[in-house]
């Protein structure tokens, strides 16, 4: 039961704060928070909510506004009293509202917010839990709330946060309707009485509130008056009540006296200082996203972008749109000119899209609004449908947000397509953000087709320019059924690769994919415009053939069948199979991977991963196929040698050497590069005519490894080693 204290006619009731609220206030007061300024945002936001409510009620009953037509928020600093006052003409609170809302009934968010705070959440999230009012105690030692609701008398709530608060009927100056919050600031928080600081905080957090926020400041100005007027003013001053602050205060700051000889004397004048109340509206700029896009200049968009992002460069492109119907929201999205250096830094909190609800700022890093691959997009989304006290947990479940997200992604893709029409600007965009588009193809199955239209690659026919897959398809030959591509480390490397020899000789265009993310991208992008994407480095490459070519291929298969079997026996588990190649022209052999295995480039990328999964590595790397070129003299001579004696040790050694060299030229790495190097050195010595025995005699201590015998000579000492 509340205690009742009688002060003459006035009845003061004292209430204890509900336990959780008392705990929250204690946490706010006794913990150091660096960003105390958010209290002003919360109080302005509460005022805006109250104004929203009365505006909504007045739609059905206009008489609700009889107690005050103007919907506004006033901020009044008073350095003499050390108070900061916020006044709104919103709906106000009844006595019951005051008692329930400000102390005795804990909001569902109170406990959740305390848990979040103790887990390291930022104090600025307080408003998302519906307990923003208590942030006033970040800066105030005592708070007085005077409020008037249309259905009740004017009441005053007061608390110094000592575990209790008082409520009494207020017979002071009538406020008509609304709420006045008076903060008695702590000694070290007087910065919030300064004009500069208040303006800075309002601009940062509340410049887009839908009601005028006016700052009232007492200022001084000089005024020149005659002596007669000064005497009159002085007489009036003596009569007036000392407490009336609105009358000008007069100080004598000197007089200009003229020579008053004779009767023709001039009036004397004095300069006085008078105090006056200066009013300044702090949020004159109507939120740019609420205006008609046709009325906004590129300069205005540019200024807004810079103030939003702190970028010193102009944006590259902008999309301004609104969605109406069952769901209402407005959005203003920008593409920056450059990618930030930490674009893919997962742990860093991105401040990409600011979320507003009915012009009230909610949060500036809303991950749920946009997929990760579009994390470079900057802008503002203002929803009419989300609740103002939405928390991150609620956002994750919000169906409204899912619809907003879908629309934002759609509009971003529209913006990219529009930008693609301007080749110069699209080139800048693609250099900065191509990885994001490719990540999108990997992650976003719904928009994969639209994203694939935005890709640009160098090809075997594009020269220095990059080309789109649509342009590639338009240049395809009649007999060509697939889009051919190769992945690798650089344009030069893939252009000189053995894999593209036959394809290019036939006049087919090959797409060069040279970024690591391309490997992940093509795993998901199986086809484009009805044409399948085929890697020229994987098994099963089918090139259009005429009857003569088919016949020749069958003959080669029969002719080299025994050699293929022998090579498979020699290489054993190193390869899955050995086949005749239809892709080689000038190279004797190459290593291709199975359709679902990793390419050489992908294997290189995966080996570079610090936290790789070795079990997957073994499985995905095992599928290598050796393809031999039946038209190459090395392969033909090897066939003849094998036909003559399939147990010839030289054949085995040469097969291993061919395989290892093919591994290197196909982009793979060797498991034992030293053994391969020693073989090559031995061949160099033979080529230079250096006698192995001489080298051994000169270096008696440097024993030549037994497992690397010479390539030529007698049968006992002239064979290359056999590698297991």
Curated annotation (Swiss-Prot):
Protein name: Heat shock protein HSP 90-beta
Modified residues (N6-acetyllysine): 435, 481, 624
Motif (TPR repeat-binding): 720-724
Function statement: Molecular chaperone that promotes the maturation, structural maintenance and proper regulation of specific target proteins involved for instance in cell cycle control and signal transduction. Undergoes a functional cycle linked to its ATPase activity. This cycle probably induces conformational changes in the client proteins, thereby causing their activation. Interacts dynamically with various co-chaperones that modulate its substrate recognition, ATPase cycle and chaperone function.
Regulation: In the resting state, through the dimerization of its C-terminal domain, HSP90 forms a homodimer which is defined as the open conformation. Upon ATP-binding, the N-terminal domain undergoes significant conformational changes and comes in contact to form an active closed conformation. After HSP90 finishes its chaperoning tasks of assisting the proper folding, stabilization and activation of client proteins under the active state, ATP molecule is hydrolyzed to ADP which then dissociates from HSP90 and directs the protein back to the resting state.
Organism: Homo sapiens (Human)
PROSITE patterns, alphabetized: HSP90 (PS00298)
Region called Interaction with BIRC2, residue ranges: 2-214
SMART domains: HATPase_c
Phosphoserine modification, residue list: 226, 255, 261, 307, 445, 669, 718
Region span, Disordered: 222-270, 696-724
Entry annotated with the keyword Cell membrane: yes
Gene: HSP90AB1
Location of the region described as Interaction with TP53 in the Swiss-Prot/TrEMBL record: 2-527
Amino acid composition bias (Acidic residues), ranges on this chain: 225-244
NCBIfam families linked: PRK05218.1 (NF003555)
Record keywords: Acetylation, ATP-binding, Cell membrane, Chaperone, Cytoplasm, Glycoprotein, Membrane, Methylation, Nucleotide-binding, Nucleus, Phosphoprotein, S-nitrosylation, Secreted, Stress response, Ubl conjugation
Region annotation (Interaction with AHSA1) ranges: 215-552
Residues with PTM N6-malonyllysine: 399
């Amino acid at each position: 039961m509340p205690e009742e204290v009688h002060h003459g006619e006035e009845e003061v009731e004292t209430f204890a704060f509900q336990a959780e609220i008392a705990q929250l206030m204690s946490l706010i007061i006794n913990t150091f928070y660096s960003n105390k300024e958010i209290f002003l945002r919360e109080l302005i936001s509460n005022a805006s909510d109250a104004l929203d409510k009365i505006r909504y009620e007045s739609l059905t009953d206009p008489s609700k506004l009889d107690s005050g037509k103007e919907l506004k928020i006033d901020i009044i600093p008073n350095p003499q009293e050390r108070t900061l006052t916020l006044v709104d003409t919103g709906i106000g609170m009844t006595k019951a509202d005051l008692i329930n809302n400000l102390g005795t009934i804990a909001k569902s968010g109170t406990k959740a917010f305390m848990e979040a705070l103790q887990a390291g959440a930022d104090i600025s999230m307080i408003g998302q839990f519906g307990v923003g009012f208590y942030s006033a105690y970040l800066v105030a030692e005592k708070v007085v709330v005077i409020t008037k609701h249309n259905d009740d008398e004017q009441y005053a709530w007061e608390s110094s946060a000592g575990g209790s608060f008082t409520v009494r009927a207020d017979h002071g100056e009538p406020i008509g309707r609304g709420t006045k919050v008076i903060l008695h600031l702590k000694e070290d928080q007087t910065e919030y009485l300064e004009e500069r600081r208040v303006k800075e905080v309002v601009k940062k957090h509340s410049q887009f509130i839908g009601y005028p926020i006016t700052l009232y400041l007492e200022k001084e100005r000089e005024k020149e008056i005659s002596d007669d007027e000064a005497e009159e003013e002085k007489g009036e001053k003596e009569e007036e009540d000392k407490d009336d602050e609105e009358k000008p205060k007069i100080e004598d700051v000197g007089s200009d006296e003229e020579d008053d000889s004779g009767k023709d004397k001039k009036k004397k004048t004095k300069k006085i200082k008078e105090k006056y109340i200066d009013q300044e509206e702090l949020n004159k700029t109507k939120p740019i996203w609420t205006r008609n896009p046709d009325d906004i200049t590129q300069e205005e968009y540019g200024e807004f972008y810079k103030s939003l992002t702190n970028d010193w460069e102009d944006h590259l492109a902008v999309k301004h749109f609104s969605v109406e119907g069952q769901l209402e929201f407005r959005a203003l999205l920008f593409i920056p000119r450059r990618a930030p250096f930490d674009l893919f830094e997962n742990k860093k909190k991105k401040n990409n899209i600011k979320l507003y609800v009915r012009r009230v700022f909610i949060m500036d890093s809303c991950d749920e609004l946009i997929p990760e691959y579009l994390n470079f997009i900057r802008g503002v989304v203002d929803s009419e449908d989300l609740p103002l006290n939405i928390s991150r947990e609620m956002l994750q479940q919000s169906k409204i947000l899912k619809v907003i997200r879908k629309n934002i992604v759609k509009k971003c893709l529209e913006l990219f397509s529009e930008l693609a029409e301007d080749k110069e600007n699209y080139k800048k965009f693609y250099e900065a953000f191509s990885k994001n588009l490719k990540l999108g193809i990997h992650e976003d199955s719904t928009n994969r087709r639209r994203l694939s239209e935005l890709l640009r690659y160098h090809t075997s026919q594009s020269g220095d320019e990059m080309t789109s897959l649509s342009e590639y398809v338009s240049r395809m030959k009649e007999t060509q059924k697939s889009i051919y591509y190769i992945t690798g480390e650089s344009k030069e490397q893939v252009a000189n690769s053995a894999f593209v020899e036959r394809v290019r000789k036939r006049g087919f265009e090959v797409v060069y994919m040279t970024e690591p993310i391309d490997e992940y991208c093509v795993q998901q992008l199986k086809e484009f415009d009805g044409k399948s994407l085929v890697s020229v480095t994987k098994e099963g490459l089918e090139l259009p053939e005429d009857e003569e070519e088919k016949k020749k291929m069958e003959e080669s298969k029969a002719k080299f069948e025994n050699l293929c079997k022998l090579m498979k026996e020699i290489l054993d588990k190193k390869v899955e199979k050995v086949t005749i190649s239809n892709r080689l022209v000038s190279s004797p052999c190459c290593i291709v991977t199975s359709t679902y295995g990793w390419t050489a480039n992908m294997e290189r990328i995966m080996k570079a991963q610090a936290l790789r999964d070795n079990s997957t590595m073994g499985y995905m790397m095992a599928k290598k196929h050796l393809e031999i070129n039946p038209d190459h003299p090395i392969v033909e001579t090897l066939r003849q040698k094998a036909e003559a004696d399939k147990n010839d040790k030289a054949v085995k050694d040469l097969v291993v050497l061919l395989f290892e060299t093919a591994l290197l030229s196909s982009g793979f790495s060797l498991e034992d590069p030293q053994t391969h190097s020693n073989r090559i050195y031995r061949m160099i010595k033979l080529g230079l005519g250096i006698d192995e025995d001489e080298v051994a005699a000169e270096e008696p201590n440097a024993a030549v490894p037994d497992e690397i015998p010479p390539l030529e000579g007698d049968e006992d000492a002239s064979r290359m080693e056999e590698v297991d």
